């Protein structure tokens, strides 16, 4: 459960993240593909090389979805319902992959935000991304 302090930290840091949507999202996906190569199977039609425009484009979509989640921290289930349906019923993505991408996204945040990515911010984002992953996996139950 996100506290009021968590929500404040998430929103404050997100303004910096959103400015670099394609870059941060693309880097997170690239890290996931390198670290967890089995995740590439969901993107057979993509050029998965580092710096690929397709990966950056999808990374921007990921960050846009997270932006929607940040705007709706009190109602993530409703905000992400359509995305949850898409991944569960159409794309049939194994929900463990949401957690893998969350881990990679946190590494990207730490790299780019440096000292601003304090232990408190890290904890808030860990809770936030875990909540997002849980909501995206709701339709699998």
From Swiss-Prot:
Cellular component terms (Gene Ontology): blood microparticle; haptoglobin-hemoglobin complex; hemoglobin complex
Keyword Transport tagged: yes
Tissue specificity remark: Red blood cells.
Keywords from the UniProt entry: Heme, Iron, Metal-binding, Oxygen transport, Transport
Family that this chain belongs to: Belongs to the globin family.
PANTHER family with a match to the protein in the record: HEMOGLOBIN FAMILY MEMBER, HEMOGLOBIN SUBUNIT ZETA
Name assigned to this protein: Hemoglobin subunit alpha-D
Lineage: Eukaryota, Metazoa, Chordata, Craniata, Vertebrata
């Amino acid at each position: 459960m996100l506290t009021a302090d968590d929500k404040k930290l998430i929103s404050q840091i997100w303004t910096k993240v959103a400015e670099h949507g394609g870059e941060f999202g693309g880097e997170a996906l690239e890290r996931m593909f390198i670290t967890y190569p089995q995740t590439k199977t969901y993107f057979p039609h993509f050029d998965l090389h580092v710096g690929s425009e397709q990966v950056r484009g999808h990374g921007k979509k990921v960050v846009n979805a997270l932006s929607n989640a940040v705007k709706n921290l009190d109602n993530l289930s409703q905000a992400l319902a359509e995305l949850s349906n898409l991944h569960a019923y159409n794309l049939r993505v194994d929900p463990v992959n949401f957690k893998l991408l969350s881990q990679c996204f946190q590494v990207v945040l730490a790299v780019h935000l440096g000292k601003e990515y304090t232990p408190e911010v890290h904890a808030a984002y860990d809770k936030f991304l875990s909540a997002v992953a849980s909501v995206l996996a709701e339709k699998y139950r």
